[in-house]
Amino acid sequence: NVPVVPGETLVFFDEIQSCRNAISSLRFFHEQYPELHVVAAGSLLEFALSEIPSFGVGRIRSMFIYPFSFDEFLSAMGEEELLRVKNEASLISPLSDLLHEKLNKLLKEFLVLGGMPEVVMNYAVKRDINECQNVLNDLIISYKTDFAKYKKRVPSLRITEVFNSVSKQSGSKFVYSRTESKSDIQQIKTATELLMMAGLVIPVTHSSSNGIPLGAEANRKKRKLLIFDTGILQRLLGFDIRDLLFQNDFDAINKGAIAEVFAGLEILKAMSCYEKNDLYFWQREAVSSSAEVDYVLQIKDKVIPVEVKSAKKGSMKSLFIFLEEKKSEYGVRLSMENFSSYKNVNV
């Protein structure tokens, strides 16, 4: 009994992946009722879309929505002023020690909680981080239950095995044979592609990074894979969250490459939501001088290397090798440090 007023009412189809007819009806709304605003959302939606022969090409606009970013988390926690100060800080005007310490504390909380809306909402209201772990566990169970809906494509057990294996191989090149089931590599590859299609697993592809676009020199046989949320990741790995919350050095915080995953996800969330963006890394394999840079960004016509480092120490050998070889203007180091610079590296 709710009136539908064109131009004023927003019709929202949630969990639309459960009904193929509802997905197909989106084309009707565009052609027959264009003045009505319609939004559709669903989990593992890409799985369902791949099973529909034609899906409103040119009539439907897609948005790629991710869990909360760290900035959005700060806003949800009511830390608007802290967020403003953080975003206004720079190399020449860093944060005060007090605010820097507070931000690091909130960052560690965010690494544990992740950005799933239900988790963030629960924490914003109750501030009970242990209860949020239960919410994360429930979300993981829900995702794995949803995998069963796509057993016609590949057994749901294979999808679950790959999902678990991605978490264990975070921070290194993904090796199919390291999944629990080693008997059917093709099924494992199919399950991996499905998880990437659904956005639950984010690929980071090797690029030689000699120029732009980075994708022109991508080697898709060399990939790292990221779980889409750090909260989900730490639950899959069974971390003792006290290790993440109370350690002051990044080595402890970077268990399971969680800091590297966080950095990649934040880079992705900062990009346009109207296209499916790609992440790249660089690696040089040489007997006497191997090197690896965690992420490589294309910013306008520049190629910028990004390294995630531990604590307030650590060599930047790989970063400097990249800067020298690729003649990049500057590099970026991400750590628990305040804003600063060292030679041609921004911290």
Placement of each model-derived feature along the sequence:
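Conserved P-loop NTPase "ATPase switch" module shared by AAA+ and STAND
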Residues: 3-22
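Structural recognition of the conserved hydrophobic beta-strand(s) that form the central parallel beta-sheet
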Residues: 12, 37-43, 64, 73
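A short beta-strand-to-loop transition that corresponds to the Sensor-1 phosphate-sensing loop
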Residues: 15, 41-46, 66-68, 230-231, ...
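Sensor-1/coupling segment of RecA-like P-loop NTPase cores
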Residues: 31-53, 195
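Interdomain motor-coupling "hinge/lid" segment immediately C-terminal to the ATP-binding subdomain
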Residues: 50-168
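Accessory nucleic acid-recognition modules appended to NTPase machines
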Residues: 120-291, 297
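Active-site beta-strand-loop-beta-strand hairpin of nuclease catalytic cores
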Residues: 297-305
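Catalytic cores of nucleic-acid endonucleases
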Residues: 310-346
